[in-house]
Design a protein with these regions (language model features):
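An N-terminal hydrophobic leader/cap segment in hydrolases
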Residues: 5-62
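Conserved alpha/beta-hydrolase
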Residues: 92, 99-121
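Gly/Ala-rich beta-loop-alpha elbow adjacent to hydrolase catalytic centers
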Residues: 147-156
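Alpha/beta-hydrolase active-site loop
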Residues: 122-145
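Conserved alpha/beta-hydrolase fold motif
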Residues: 145-147, 171
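Short beta-strand-to-loop junctions in surface cap/lid or active-site-entrance loops
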Residues: 70-80
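Active-site glycine-rich loops that stabilize anionic/oxyanionic intermediates
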Residues: 79, 86-90
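The alpha/beta-hydrolase serine catalytic core
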Residues: 168-205
Length: 205
């Protein structure tokens, strides 16, 4: 652990220094690289042969939308539908401890793997892209309730703001960041990105 910290520090600062240098020569490429490091999850994916036990108990369904494959899991119940939205570097298996309690409600439960997470395709996990996934899933399963955790909670709020789904009666938001700027600032500080890159990234989000 002691050796990992200096290595991680040097790695992040080296990446940041390279992006800063690149921003003066190829600014568009520098922003693309910074955006990639910020939005690409490093964990949360798995393959079908490594499907968590919790998800094996569900009905697995995929939705194809444009070039995306959206993975969903359904636990059948009554006509009321609860849609579960996980957070950053996660997947639908994160609900395993909550599922037994939700099943007692009798509702049909639908969980979604976000972009570049679980079995869903993609390389980037962003709020607008995730909200688009939610909208496609919501059109098919017509949820009455949405439960979102962390970035999934923030995305749930953004989804309802943008798409105005009249069928959604209630939303439960768990541990969602109150200010996305804080997350972005932490990222730019970690890499010591220059003001030029910082401002462009902020405008992008």
């Amino acid at each position: 652990i002691f050796m990992k910290k200096p290595f991680y520090f040097l790695l992040t600062k080296s990446i940041g220094a390279y992006i800063n240098l690149l921003s003066f020569i190829f600014p568009a490429k520098a922003i693309q690289m910074a955006h990639g490091y910020f939005s690409e999850p490093r964990k949360g994916k798995f393959t079908i042969d490594k499907l968590p036990k919790t998800l094996k108990e569900a009905i697995s369904e995929t939705i194809i939308h444009n070039d995306d494959i959206i993975q969903t899991y359904i636990w059948k119940g009554n006509e009321n539908v609860v849609l579960l939205i996980h957070g950053w570097e996660s997947n639908s298996s994160r609900w395993k401890k909550m599922l037994p309690y939700l099943k007692k409600s009798g509702c049909t439960i639908v969980a979604i793997d976000g972009p570049a997470q679980g079995l869903s395709t993609g390389k980037e996990f962003t709020v607008p892209k995730y909200a688009e996934f939610i909208d496609i899933v919501a059109q098919k399963y017509q949820p009455n309730y949405i439960i979102g955790h962390s970035m999934g909670g923030k995305t749930s709020l953004y989804y309802q703001y943008k798409y105005q789904n009249p069928r959604v009666q209630k939303m439960i938001i768990l541990g969602a960041p109150s200010d996305f700027t804080i997350i972005l600032n932490n990222f730019t500080r970690m890499l010591s990105l220059n003001n030029k890159v910082r401002k462009t990234l902020k405008n992008k989000y």
